[in-house]
């Protein structure tokens, strides 16, 4: 078994057994998920059939179904979705599935969306291909999550430490580490920006620190530049490279669509 397959199995086992990590997901309340839901709802036609990947505790799927859509929420962990049964209805169902091997037929959904999933998969290109496969022609793909390549994360950490706070676990635990992370992210993002092809960078998940949050368990060094280039290369049309709801988010997205803190790519299958 190669290293990436081993890491994939370790991640599955971790997500099936970690009570502490489940508590982090359960803290994702309506307020936390509202921006994601609003962005998906903005592009979904009335009564769309939606696939919500990596839905964790299932709440985001429930919120989308409340808007009149038919929603299937999925997660790799039965443990995470254990409480979702009480949310199910005629327009909402859940299933356990791996984003790298979705149990759905080609062109099944009007919308395929994910929030804070892509950085956790061990093969991001394959996950994106699976999303495109089950998406209908003309359908909407929305991929959201942290831009781990953003140089602005280190700025936030340096400000926090200057005020007496702590840095980010794994990524920027000291000022020196934060400065190095910011510089590396800037040079990496610039390299990606001017590269002809997507360059998906794998990283080894740090599961010992995953219970502290901060995407220590990420397996892909996520960047919107990779996703943009890959989707375009596979016939998708980018509608929004950095979609946002708030005024601050829209300004950030307009000024730094590929370098901001978050990924919020919206594309259409042509």
Predicted regions and their residues:
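Conserved N-terminal segment of class I S-adenosyl-L-methionine
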Residues: 1-100, 111-113, 220, 260-263
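Short glycine-centered segments of the SAM/dcSAM-binding site in methyltransferase folds
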Residues: 49, 139-140
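A generic structural signal for alpha->beta connector loops
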Residues: 68, 91, 138, 235-238
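Active-site beta-strand termini and strand-to-loop segments that position acidic
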Residues: 267-270
